């Protein structure tokens, strides 16, 4: 009996599939007939006694006064070409190649110097004077708005200095002038951000995946008329957005940016279009400072850094695993030095600020490596030491105390303290064993960003106003986390209006300002 029922259900499903197929074929036939692709077949009596469908009247032609002169697409049949003819194939190949060339042209870097008007995408005109001023979670699962650190953790803190810093950092509040979902700084996903070093006002730069550069002066205030009307629902459309400026100095992703503290009128930006450009904030012009000799050379740059005591030398890494150095005062051919440090991409790197001949790299090959430029061979470069993680390492950030913070896809933040190991006194050729390269602190942190969220990277505050070093990093639960160099969490910054993960988190170098950028090009600012 059970077998008969099974057969009956199967038969019902088979008949349903046949009926669905017939209905689809009938619809396609009617659509083709109405489009005039072929005449309707002669009517045949149907088993169900259905009446013959009436032929739709041909639409009346309306004579146009002025015919459009735009070229119209025509099929091979109308052009008299056989479907499989060599002419048709050649024509299709030519069209495909033309489309590919147009797409490649969009991505080729532009080596020219740009004026403000040539870079401007949207927003107000930049003025140099006004711009610069006178002066742990479940692995791989994001739980939006669920806190992992809060007031209770602060109350339980017994160390007075740590408790005071936790209260200070947790006391930062979102910029009140506009909600984060109103501050769209770039058209596409934010990949990198930085603050201008000025303490007079928060000036924020953000680079996105298409080469756009957004500029926000967060000292601006909402117009008085808008403040008065904010309770009036009818006046909601009249509430102005913040004043922003969007430029386009690059043709591909802006991967990293840097403002040297002794050269505050210049912003350096590195890009996947293989170039490093210098934006003069006073003249509002952009010039190329470094790029391969040929525009056809595709060497995407993944990071940029500069030594605090040298405003003229650029350091960078590439997605091909190379490390480069260039003194901008010398001729390009003689001054550029490169080393191949990894077979896979270097996702992030940084110099040791007080001893910049040391630098750290994070790679897709799962390593964090420490290097010494004084003892770096071009043929077979050997690191001071390396530590291998279970999965790829996204970034390695050095602070002024000789500590390195890394983020990794094994859902950890690792902190390495080389300052306590005497890094400042190491001679050229000094090496570390595997045991000496082990991290001093490991913090659980969800780093599973997926495809649409920018990779999480730790960033230290360059000159903190207390002895405790601290860094910030995005949190997949739509917060920005702040940690000390010992791995203690200092704050978990959030607020209303944050509708996406502020994955790109940055500290101001000396003031407790923190900004976070999202995949929609919007930013959050805590002060």
Curated annotation (Swiss-Prot):
Tell me which InterPro entries the record gives.
WD40/YVTN_repeat-like_dom_sf, WD40_repeat_dom_sf, WD40_rpt, WD_repeat_DNA-damage-binding
What spans are recorded as compositionally biased (Basic residues)?
52-62
Segments carrying the region annotation (Disordered) are: 35-90, 284-303
What GO biological process terms are annotated to this protein in UniProt? DNA damage response; regulation of DNA damage checkpoint
Q: Mark the WD repeats by their residue spans.
A: 185-226, 249-289, 296-336, 341-381, 388-427, 450-493, 496-527
Question: Which SMART domains does the record match to this protein?
Answer: WD40
Indicate whether DNA damage appears among the record's keywords.
yes
Recorded protein name is DNA damage-binding protein cmr1
Species name for this entry? Neosartorya fischeri (strain ATCC 1020 / DSM 3700 / CBS 544.65 / FGSC A1164 / JCM 1740 / NRRL 181 / WB 181) (Aspergillus fischerianus)
């Amino acid at each position: 009996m059970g077998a008969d029922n099974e057969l009956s259900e199967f038969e019902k499903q088979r008949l349903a599939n046949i009926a669905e197929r017939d209905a689809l074929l009938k619809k396609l036939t009617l659509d083709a007939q109405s489009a005039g692709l072929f005449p309707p077949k002669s009517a045949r009596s149907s088993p169900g006694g259905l009446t013959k469908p009436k032929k739709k009247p041909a639409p009346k032609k309306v004579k146009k006064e002025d015919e459009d002169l735009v070229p119209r697409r025509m099929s091979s049949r109308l052009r008299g070409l056989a479907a499989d003819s060599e002419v048709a194939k050649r024509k299709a190949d030519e069209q495909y190649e033309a489309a590919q060339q147009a797409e490649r042209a969009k991505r080729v870097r532009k080596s020219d110097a740009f004026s403000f008007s040539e870079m401007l995408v949207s927003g107000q005109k930049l003025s140099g004077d006004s711009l610069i001023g006178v002066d742990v979670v479940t692995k791989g699962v994001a739980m939006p708005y669920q806190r992992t650190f809060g007031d209770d953790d602060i109350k339980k803190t017994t160390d007075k200095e740590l408790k005071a810093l936790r209260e200070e950092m947790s006391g930062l509040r979102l910029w009140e002038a506009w909600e984060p979902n109103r501050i769209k700084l770039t058209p596409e996903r934010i990949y990198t951000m930085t603050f201008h070093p000025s303490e007079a006002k928060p000036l924020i730069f953000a680079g996105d995946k298409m080469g756009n550069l957004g500029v926000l002066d967060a000292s601006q205030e909402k117009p008085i008329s808008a403040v008065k009307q904010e309770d009036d629902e009818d006046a909601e459309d009249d509430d102005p957005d913040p004043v922003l400026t969007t430029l386009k100095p690059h043709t591909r992703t802006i991967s990293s940016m840097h403002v040297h503290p002794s050269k505050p009128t210049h912003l350096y930006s590195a890009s996947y279009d293989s170039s490093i450009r210098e934006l003069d904030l006073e003249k509002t012009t952009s010039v190329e400072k470094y790029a391969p000799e040929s525009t056809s050379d595709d060497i995407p740059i993944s990071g940029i850094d500069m030594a605090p005591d040298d405003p003229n030398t650029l350091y960078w890494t590439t997605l091909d695993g190379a490390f480069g150095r260039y003194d901008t005062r010398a001729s390009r051919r003689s001054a550029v030095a490169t080393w191949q440090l990894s077979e896979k991409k270097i996702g992030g790197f940084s110099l040791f600020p007080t001893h910049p001949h040391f630098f750290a790299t994070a790679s897709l090959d799962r390593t964090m490596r420490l290097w010494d430029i004084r003892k770096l061979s071009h043929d077979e470069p050997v690191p001071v030491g390396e530590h291998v993680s279970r999965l790829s390492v996204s970034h390695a950030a050095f602070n002024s105390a000789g500590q390195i913070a890394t983020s990794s896809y094994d859902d950890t933040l690792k902190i390495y303290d080389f300052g306590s190991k005497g890094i400042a006194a190491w001679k050229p050729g000094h090496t570390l064993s595997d045991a000496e390269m082990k991290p001093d602190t490991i913090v659980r942190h969800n780093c599973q960003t997926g495809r649409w969220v920018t990779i999480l990277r730790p960033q230290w505050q360059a000159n903190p106003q207390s002895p405790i070093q601290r860094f910030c990093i995005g949190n997949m639960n739509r917060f920005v986390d702040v940690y000390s160099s010992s791995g203690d969490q200092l704050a978990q910054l959030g607020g209303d209006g944050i509708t996406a993960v502020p994955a790109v988190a940055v500290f101001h170098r000396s003031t407790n300002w923190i900004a976070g950028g999202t995949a929609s090009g919007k930013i959050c600012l805590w002060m």
